[in-house]
């Protein structure tokens, strides 16, 4: 399937998920496993009931084989996410501090490791949805303050930036064209004024 032209420079959701699965996460192995060398990485020696950091994709494989429990990130709790939601409301010009892949990580863990989470899945989904919608409204309001040279996206995640990109790039291109035209007209007007002044002196 050929994507629309305005989406061809964007990452696909599956690509963002793939990138997110390379994030390190803590697991609690249920069995001891010897070190495994892989292309580009290796799984360290795992001891039963001893916490270890591994890429998320490794954790998901071990989890599916009932060989480990996943220790959820500290931010993936109802209490923490509600605090970030309140921050979003209190600070309309700022985005709260969340991990680069918080949306994808939370989605993966809610689907693949719900039994390892400390809070009920439905409550987590609800607060994540509220938080995401609030940030989306703020980011769309921010588009109104675009200028020809930059946009402030501090605090947005990869998925959030990827969703905004099809709207931001065309708008910035138009603004840049308007800016260049204005600058060109200003220079031409200045040149004309200098020529007129020179003609007056000659007279």
Swiss-Prot record:
A matching Pfam family: PSF2_N
Subcellular location field: Nucleus
GO cellular component assignments: chromatin; CMG complex; GINS complex; nuclear replication fork
Keywords: Chromosome partition, DNA replication, Nucleus
Top-rank taxon: Eukaryota
GO biological process terms, semicolon-separated: chromosome segregation; double-strand break repair via break-induced replication; nuclear DNA replication
Protein family per UniProt: Belongs to the GINS2/PSF2 family.
Protein's job: The GINS complex plays an essential role in the initiation of DNA replication. Has a role in chromosome segregation.
Assembly and interaction partners: Component of the GINS complex which is a heterotetramer of SLD5, PSF1, PSF2 and PSF3.
Name the UniProt record assigns to this protein: DNA replication complex GINS protein PSF2
Biological source species: Candida albicans (strain SC5314 / ATCC MYA-2876)
């Amino acid at each position: 399937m050929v994507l629309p032209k305005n989406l061809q420079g964007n990452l696909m959701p599956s690509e963002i998920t793939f990138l997110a699965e390379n994030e390190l996460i803590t697991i609690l192995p249920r069995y001891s496993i010897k070190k495994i060398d892989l292309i580009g990485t290796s799984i360290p020696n795992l001891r039963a009931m001893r916490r270890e950091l591994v890429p998320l994709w490794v954790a998901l494989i071990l989890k599916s084989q009932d060989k480990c429990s996943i220790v959820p990130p500290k931010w993936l709790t109802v209490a923490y996410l509600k605090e970030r939601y309140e921050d979003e409301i209190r600070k309309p010009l700022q985005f709260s501090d969340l991990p680069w892949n918080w949306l994808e990580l939370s989605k993966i863990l809610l689907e693949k490791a719900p039994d390892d989470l400390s809070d009920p899945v439905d409550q987590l989904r609800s607060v994540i949805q509220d938080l995401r919608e609030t940030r989306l409204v703020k980011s769309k309001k921010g588009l109104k303050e675009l200028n020809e040279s930059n946009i402030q996206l501090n605090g947005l995640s990869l998925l959030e930036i990827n969703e905004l990109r099809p709207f931001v790039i065309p708008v910035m291109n138009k603004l840049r064209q308007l800016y260049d035209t204005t600058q060109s007209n200003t220079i031409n007007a200045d040149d004309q004024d200098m020529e007129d002044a020179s003609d007056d002196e000659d007279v």
